[in-house]
């Protein structure tokens, strides 16, 4: 079965919008109140959003590495987020 291309709505949505929608999907799925078919549709949409988000993050990481590599004095280091 060939892979489906990401739907246009996902591509047009910002990362933040997609993340918000994904959080809402998780909440609905965790409630356990959706009929099976609706839950499967929500799950499918969630997987699409998660994959798109992963791709967006990968592209952002690559852009940062490219920007840092333009400065020969800036060593590449693994990104570690601030923990508060």
UniProtKB/Swiss-Prot annotation:
SUPFAM superfamilies in alphabetical order: XseB-like
Report the EC number(s), separated by commas if there are several: 3.1.11.6
Q: Where in the cell is it found?
A: Cytoplasm
GO cellular component annotations of the record: cytosol; exodeoxyribonuclease VII complex
Q: Which UniProt keywords apply?
A: Cytoplasm, Exonuclease, Hydrolase, Nuclease
Concerning InterPro entries, the annotation shows: Exonuc_VII_S, Exonuc_VII_ssu_sf
BP GO annotations:
DNA catabolic process
Q: What GO terms are given for molecular function?
A: exodeoxyribonuclease VII activity
* Entry keyword Amino-acid biosynthesis: no
What chemistry does it catalyse, as a reaction equation? Exonucleolytic cleavage in either 5'- to 3'- or 3'- to 5'-direction to yield nucleoside 5'-phosphates
Q: Does the keyword Hydrolase apply?
A: yes
Task: Tell me the protein family, please.
Answer: Belongs to the XseB family.
- What NCBIfam families does this protein's entry cite? PRK00977.1-1, PRK00977.1-4, xseB
What is its quaternary makeup?
Heterooligomer composed of large and small subunits.
Q: What does this protein do?
A: Bidirectionally degrades single-stranded DNA into large acid-insoluble oligonucleotides, which are then degraded further into small acid-soluble oligonucleotides.
Recorded protein name is: Exodeoxyribonuclease 7 small subunit
* Organism this protein belongs to: Yersinia pestis
